[in-house]
Regions:
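Active-site glycine- and acidic-residue-rich loops that bind
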Residues: 64-77, 176-187, 206-224, 240-259
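N-terminal active-site wall of soluble small-molecule enzyme domains
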Residues: 94-151, 158-162
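Alpha-helix-loop-beta-strand connector modules within alpha/beta enzyme cores
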Residues: 107-130, 166, 170-172, 223-230, ...
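Hydrophobic faces of well-ordered beta-strands that scaffold small-molecule active sites
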Residues: 59-61, 90-94, 130-132, 150-152, ...
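Glycine-enriched alpha-helix->loop->beta-strand junction motifs that scaffold or abut catalytic
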Residues: 142-151, 167-173, 194-200, 228-231, ...
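Conserved anion-binding
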Residues: 99-102, 156-224
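Active-site-adjacent loop and "lid" segments of alpha/beta metabolic enzymes
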Residues: 104-113, 151-156, 212-216, 239-265, ...
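Conserved N-terminal beta1-alpha1 strand-loop-helix module at the mouth
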Residues: 51-118, 124
């Protein structure tokens, strides 16, 4: 454990004593050889003015779309391994229907009924929390019976009825910032979800349109959104997309994914979203911007240790 980590441990434990248990630090364990990794910290009492000293890291990972049993199980098994290795709680993510594919001929997914069966199986067989997105209000109720987090796609983040339906399920709602909105603009989707009864609302940065077939990330959006929501996620994979740049499909530059994560951390993000695949080049959706599953461990380790 380095000096900064030891100092943080001391500060959190001291604050826990000072506020009679209002701050709670988790343990520090030796996960691999002689390298010690800091576990996440979280404050119980958010009224404590020092709660920003510590950070709750949220990790979300999974294939862009549900493809087949082999891919699903390979990804889920790796997430279980990484959870044990790092003492974290990665949420399994995958879509049952990619309703916003560029081309009509592109693979969309297994559909609502079959997709929810797969996600329920991931929860049961692997013990992972799961997240999926919805595109229509009527999907919220059945999805809410299975998943832990309901995601609102970026293109749909201003759709009031969709947000309200997701919020009414009682599940955590993750709202992705549209490619045409600023961080400050996310105040309004957030307020819609809270007003509809959502107890926990996350906001996700995923870049902004920059001319044709390109996205750029204005990292100032992260602190802007942190002033709105406690938990702000960086979508490290969709932010490297090149929309429509691959002839009827989305292109991307996956080599920038690790840098996106570290830059987001520097700007105060406390969550990280990765679409991953055992063989992204053979993925049925968003292959060029998915992270190779074998590379996820190194990316997470870098986030936790730097």
């Amino acid at each position: 454990m380095n000096f900064r980590q030891r100092r943080l441990c001391f500060c959190v434990r001291s604050l826990g004593t000072l506020f009679r248990g209002s701050a709670k630090a988790s343990y520090c364990e030796n996960y691999s050889g002689k390298r010690k990794k800091m576990a996440n910290f979280a404050f119980v009492n958010k009224k404590c003015e020092f709660y920003n000293i510590v950070m709750r890291n949220i990790f979300i990972a999974g294939p862009c779309v549900i493809e087949n049993e082999k891919v699903t199980e390979a990804v889920a098994a790796e997430l279980v391994r990484l959870n044990k290795l790092f003492g974290i709680d990665i949420i399994f993510k995958s879509s049952f229907d990619k309703a916003n594919r560029t081309s009509l001929s592109s693979y969309r997914g297994p559909g609502l009924e079959k997709g929810l069966e797969v996600l329920a199986g991931v929860k049961k067989d692997f013990g992972l929390k799961v997240l999926t997105d919805i595109h229509e209000s009527m999907q919220a109720e059945p999805v809410g019976k299975v998943v832990d987090v309901i995601q609102i796609p970026a293109f749909l983040c201003r759709q009031t009825d969709l947000i309200v339906a997701a919020a009414k399920t009682g599940k955590t709602v993750n709202i992705k910032k549209a490619q045409f909105l600023s961080g400050e603009d996310m105040k309004y989707p957030y307020e819609k979800a809270v007003a509809a009864g959502a107890e926990e609302v996350w906001l996700t940065e995923r870049g902004n349109s920059f001319g044709y077939n390109n996205l750029v990330v204005d990292f100032r959006n992260i602190p802007y959104m942190k002033s709105i929501a406690e938990n702000v996620i960086m979508d490290c994979t969709h932010s490297v997309q090149r929309p429509g740049a691959a002839g009827g499909k989305t292109g991307g530059n996956r080599e920038f994914i690790p840098m996106m994560a570290m830059a987001a951390k520097a700007f105060g993000a406390n969550g990280y979203f990765f679409e991953v695949h055992p063989d992204p080049d053979k993925g049925l959706s968003d292959g060029p911007n998915m992270l190779r599953l074998e590379d996820l461990e190194g990316v997470i380790e870098n986030i936790l240790n730097n």
